[in-house]
Amino acid sequence: MGLIWGLFSVIIASVAQLSLGFAASHLPPMTHLWDFIAALLAFGLDARILLLGLLGYLLSVFCWYKTLHKLALSKAYALLSMSYVLVWIASMVLPGWEGTFSLKALLGVACIMSGLMLIFLPMTKQRY
């Protein structure tokens, strides 16, 4: 069950990251504090997506807490790397994100996935 909670945490955190990225690219920069506050108070789509991203992170932390009750930290922590993979893929697939494909990034994703497989695949006992 810990693995399920961990996957929920990763998926929710990835969606939250995409939401925050969208909001950050559409809201005024925080260096223009009054414009930023005015945009938040107007509670338009950008501000609502920012709020959803922040709430998503909060929900992700709850799922992560549940994960750590059921799964060893050494395994649970490795799951977090899947968020990088999900956000990378989503940025290329979703319209408007302009994520770029590169062989270097693909190699990095392959390394992450290989590492996860090494950590999570069951160990087999060898007979001598």
Curated annotation (Swiss-Prot):
Subcellular location: Cell inner membrane
Keyword Nucleus: no
Membrane spanning residue stretches: 3-23, 36-56, 77-97, 101-121
Molecular function GO labels: carbohydrate derivative transmembrane transporter activity
Source taxon at top rank: Bacteria
GO biological process, one term: lipopolysaccharide biosynthetic process
Regions of this protein lying in the Periplasmic compartment: 24-35, 98-100
Gene3D superfamilies per the UniProt record, alphabetical: 1.10.3730.20
Cytoplasmic side: 1-2, 57-76, 122-128
Protein's UniProt keywords contain Transmembrane helix: yes
GO CC field: plasma membrane
Record keywords, A-Z: Cell inner membrane, Cell membrane, Lipid A biosynthesis, Lipid biosynthesis, Lipid metabolism, Lipopolysaccharide biosynthesis, Membrane, Transmembrane, Transmembrane helix, Transport
Membrane protein topology class: Multi-pass membrane protein
Pathway(s) of this molecule: Bacterial outer membrane biogenesis; lipopolysaccharide biosynthesis
HAMAP family: Flippase_ArnF
Similarity comment: family membership: Belongs to the ArnF family.
Known function: Translocates 4-amino-4-deoxy-L-arabinose-phosphoundecaprenol (alpha-L-Ara4N-phosphoundecaprenol) from the cytoplasmic to the periplasmic side of the inner membrane.
Subunit structure as annotated in this protein's UniProt entry: Heterodimer of ArnE and ArnF.
Protein name: Probable 4-amino-4-deoxy-L-arabinose-phosphoundecaprenol flippase subunit ArnF
Organism: Escherichia coli O9:H4 (strain HS)
The organism's taxonomic lineage, starting at the top: Bacteria, Pseudomonadati, Pseudomonadota, Gammaproteobacteria, Enterobacterales
Gene (UniProt): arnF
